[in-house]
UniProtKB/Swiss-Prot annotation:
InterPro entries for this protein: ThiF/MoeB/HesA, ThiF_NAD_FAD-bd, UAE_UbL_dom, Ub-E1_IAD_1, Ub_act_enz_dom_a_sf, Uba2, UBA_E1_SCCH, Ubiquitin-activating_enz
Lineage: Eukaryota, Fungi, Dikarya, Ascomycota, Taphrinomycotina
Protein name (Swiss-Prot/TrEMBL): Ubiquitin-activating enzyme E1-like
Oligomeric form and interacting partners: Heterodimer of uba2 and aos1. The complex binds pmt3.
The protein's role, per its UniProt record: The dimeric enzyme acts as a SUMO/pmt3 E1 ligase. It mediates ATP-dependent activation of pmt3 and formation of a thioester with a conserved cysteine residue on aos1.
C-alpha cells in the first residue's frame, strides 16, 4: 500500500480494484461513534477492512436510539465505542476491532500512535476535538476523511498534509455569545429568553455556582453592561433569599414568580429613555394566571404545541415543585440537561413567559430544546449518505490520484443534492498546517536545552538569535534563557511520549523585503527516544530531512476597492447559503430566486469580473457547513 509520503500528483494512480484491495488490508481509526460513526463502522466492516480502532468519550443517551442503530435501550449509559464495536462485530467477525472509551486528546494518543493508521475518519460533533484530530493527522502525515451533518445538509472533506486544505484553512464561525445587557434588559429574540431561563434563572434557583455557562458574555463589558452586571448581582442576592422557600408551598413559588415576572419587569419598565424606540415590557399577574392555570390540562404532554401563557405558568409551577423535591434529596447542584424532562420544562416555561412579557414570539418546547441544548437536528438518512461518501473518498485516497479527490457537499438544490468541488491547495496563511516537522531522536534524557538551541537550531538550521522554544509553555527565548542548562528531563520533555516542541523564529541567512531577518513558518520538533548506537556519539540524531524551513507568508492587505469586492462576494455567499433563496449560476450572472414567492420573482446580479471568491469569502461559505 502506498504511504502518504509516496502520494503525489505525478504518481501513477492505481485501478479501483487495486485500491479496493489496499482498502481491505488497511488499518483505520474512527473517531466518534455517534450518528455518522455508527454508519461508518458498519460500512468499514461490510467493506472488509483489515482493522478498525474506534474511540469515543460519550455514553449512550436515550435520545441517540432513533438514529444510532448500533445501540438499544439496554445500552443506555454504556460507552458508545465499546457497545458499537461489540454490536458491529457480528457484521464481519474477521475484522479486528479495538474500542476505546476515552478522550482523543489524552497523551497516550500522540503523534506516534496516529502513525500506525493508514486512514483516519472523523465523525465528531465537537469543534475543538475536530481541530485536535486535524492537527495530529497533519503531524503524523496520515490522510484524514473529515465529515459532518446538520439536518438535510452534510459534507465530506479530504485532508492530506501539504496537498489539500486542512480543517483550519478556512476559519470557522465561533459560538455565539450574547451581551448581558441584551439578555437581562432588552431581549428581542426567542434565543435571548432561552439563554436567560437556562443560564440565569435556573442556576439562581437550583445551583450554588452563580456563574453562567459562558453564553452570557461579560468579559468585555462596557459601562452599560457593567451596570447591568451590578444590577444582576443585586437581584441575585434577593433571589437567593427566596431559595429556601422553594417547594415548601405555593407561597414560595408565588414569591419567586412575583419577583421575576412582576416586580423586576415594573422596575425595568421605569428605566428612563429605555423604551423610546421599542414597546415596553408588560408584567404578569400571579393571581390572574393562577386562576387560568387551573383550567390548563397537562400542556406538557405535547412538546410540539406552543403553550399559552396560562399553560406556561402551570408548567413552570409544576417543574419547580419537581425540581425542589430533587434538590432536597440530593447533595449535588442541579444542572440543565436537554434530556431531563424536569429541567427542560422549567426552561421552556420560563423562556415563554419572558417572551410574552417582552412581546416576543413564543416557541414550542421542542424548538426550545434545540436552542437550549444546542442541538443540531440529526437525520439518520443524511448520516448514512455521508458515511457512504466517506468510504468512496477513502478508496480514492488509496488509489493515489490526488487530482481526482473531491470535497462533497450534500445540500437541498433544485436539480441535485450532491455538489462536488476539487480539493484546494493548503492556505499559505493557515496557522495550523503551515509548519515543518522535524523528528529528533534522543538517546539521553540528560540532553540539555542548550544543545537544542545552539547546536541544532542555530548551527544546523540557521536560526537567528531571535528564536523561541515552547513546550506547554515558553521554555526559551532571548530574554528568557534560564533553562538553557536544564535537561530535557528537568523540563518535562519526555522522548518516550513523543513530546512536540514548537520553534518560532527568524532566519539568519534569509532577508525580507525590508532587509530584515525574515520570519519562518513554525518548526515542530517531535522528540522521540532512539538507541544510543545510532547517534555516532552525539546525544541526538535528526531523523527527518527538515533542513529547509520556508518563510512565513503575510496575507496581502486589501485596498478599499478590494474590500468592496470582498463585501459583495460575502453577500453573494450569504445569498447562496440562505434557506429562503436559491442561487442559479449562469456564467457571469447569478439569478437569485426567492423560494417563498413566485418563481418569477428573481433578481439579476452581475458578478465581479474575477469570479473566484477571495479566501475570506470562500471561508465563510465553507464555514457554514464545516461547523456541523
Amino acid at each position: 500500500m502506498p504511504t502518504l509520503m509516496q502520494l503525489s500528483n505525478d504518481m501513477k494512480p492505481l485501478t479501483f480494484v487495486e485500491a479496493l484491495r489496499n482498502f481491505k488490508s488497511a488499518k483505520v481509526l474512527l473517531v466518534g461513534a455517534g450518528g455518522i460513526g455508527c454508519e461508518l463502522l458498519k460500512n468499514l466492516l461490510m467493506s472488509g477492512v483489515k482493522e478498525v480502532h474506534i474511540i469515543d468519550l460519550d455514553t449512550i443517551d436515550l435520545s441517540n436510539l432513533n438514529r444510532q442503530f448500533l445501540f438499544r435501550k439496554k445500552h443506555v449509559k454504556q460507552p458508545k465505542a465499546i457497545v458499537a464495536a461489540k454490536t458491529a462485530s457480528s457484521f464481519n467477525p474477521n475484522v479486528k476491532l479495538e474500542a476505546y472509551h476515552a478522550n482523543i486528546k489524552e497523551d497516550r494518543f500522540n503523534v506516534a500512535w496516529f502513525r500506525q493508521f493508514d486512514l483516519v475518519f472523523n465523525a465528531l460533533d465537537n469543534l475543538d476535538a475536530r481541530r485536535h484530530v486535524n492537527k495530529q493527522c497533519l503531524l503524523a502525515s496520515v490522510p484524514l476523511i473529515e465529515s459532518g451533518t446538520t439536518g438535510f445538509l452534510g459534507q465530506v472533506q479530504v485532508i492530506i498534509h501539504g496537498k489539500t486544505e486542512c480543517y483550519d484553512c478556512n476559519p470557522k464561525e465561533p459560538p455565539k455569545t450574547y451581551p448581558v445587557c441584551t439578555i437581562r434588559s432588552t431581549p428581542s429574540q426567542p434565543i435571548h429568553c432561552v439563554v436567560w431561563a437556562k443560564s440565569y434563572f435556573f442556576p439562581q434557583l437550583f445551583s450554588n455556582d452563580q456563574e453562567s455557562d459562558g453564553i452570557i458574555d461579560n468579559v468585555s463589558a462596557n459601562e452599560m453592561e457593567r451596570r447591568e452586571i451590578a444590577e444582576l448581582a443585586r437581584e441575585t442576592t434577593e433571589l437567593n433569599e427566596l431559595r429556601s422557600s422553594i417547594g415548601q408551598s405555593d407561597n414560595g413559588f408565588e414569591k419567586i414568580f412575583t419577583k421575576m415576572f412582576t416586580k423586576d419587569i415594573v422596575r425595568l419598565r421605569e428605566v428612563p429613555d429605555a423604551w423610546t424606540y421599542r414597546s415596553p415590557p408588560k408584567e404578569l399577574s400571579y393571581s390572574e394566571l393562577l386562576e387560568n392555570a387551573e383550567k390548563a390540562t397537562s400542556p406538557w404532554l405535547n412538546e410540539q404545541n406552543v403553550w399559552n401563557v396560562a399553560e406556561s405558568f402551570a408548567v413552570l409551577r409544576d417543574s419547580i415543585r419537581r425540581l425542589a423535591l430533587r434538590s432536597k434529596s440530593s447533595k449535588d447542584d442541579l444542572s440543565f440537561d436537554k434530556d431531563d424532562k424536569d429541567t427542560l420544562d422549567f426552561v421552556a416555561a420560563a423562556a415563554n413567559l419572558r417572551a410574552h412579557v417582552f412581546g416576543i414570539q413564543q416557541l414550542s418546547e421542542f424548538d426550545i430544546k434545540q436552542m437550549a441544548g444546542n442541538i443540531i437536528p440529526a437525520i439518520a438518512t443524511t448520516n448514512a449518505v455521508i458515511a457512504g461518501l466517506c468510504i468512496t473518498q477513502a478508496i480514492k485516497v488509496l488509489q493515489g490520484d490526488l487530482n481526482d479527490l473531491k470535497n462533497i457537499y450534500l445540500a437541498k438544490r433544485p436539480t441535485r443534492v450532491l455538489h462536488c468541488e476539487k480539493t484546494c491547495k493548503p492556505n499559505p496563511y493557515c496557522p495550523t498546517c503551515s509548519f515543518v516537522l522535524l523528528q529528533l531522536g534522543v538517546n539521553d534524557k540528560n540532553m540539555t536545552l542548550r544543545v537544542l538551541v545552539d547546536d541544532i537550531l542555530k548551527s544546523r538550521l540557521h536560526y537567528s538569535e531571535e528564536v523561541s522554544v515552547l513546550n506547554d509553555k515558553l521554555i526559551y527565548d532571548p530574554d528568557f534563557d534560564d533553562n538553557l542548562d536544564k535537561t530535557f528531563d528537568d523540563l518535562g520533555i519526555n522522548p518516550a511520549k513523543n513530546t512536540i516542541l514548537t520553534v518560532l523564529g527568524d532566519s539568519a541567512v534569509e532577508k525580507d523585503d525590508d532587509g530584515e531577518e525574515a520570519t519562518r513558518v513554525p518548526l515542530l520538533i517531535e522528540v522521540t527516544f532512539i538507541d544510543s548506537n545510532s547517534t555516532e556519539g552525539l546525544p541526538y540524531q535528526i531523523l527527518s530531512n527538515a533542513t529547509s524551513i520556508p518563510l512565513k507568508q503575510q496575507p496581502p492587505s486589501n485596498s478599499p476597492e478590494d474590500s468592496q469586492v470582498l463585501t459583495d462576494e460575502i453577500n453573494e455567499v450569504n445569498d447562496f447559503s440562505s434557506s429562503e433563496r436559491i442561487v442559479i449560476n449562469l456564467d457571469e450572472y447569478d439569478i437569485i430566486v426567492d423560494s417563498k414567492t413566485s418563481s418569477h420573482n428573481k433578481q439579476l446580479k452581475r458578478r465581479p469580473s474575477n469570479d473566484t471568491l477571495t479566501q475570506e469569502a470562500k471561508s465563510k461559505k465553507q464555514a457554514k457547513i464545516h461547523t456541523m
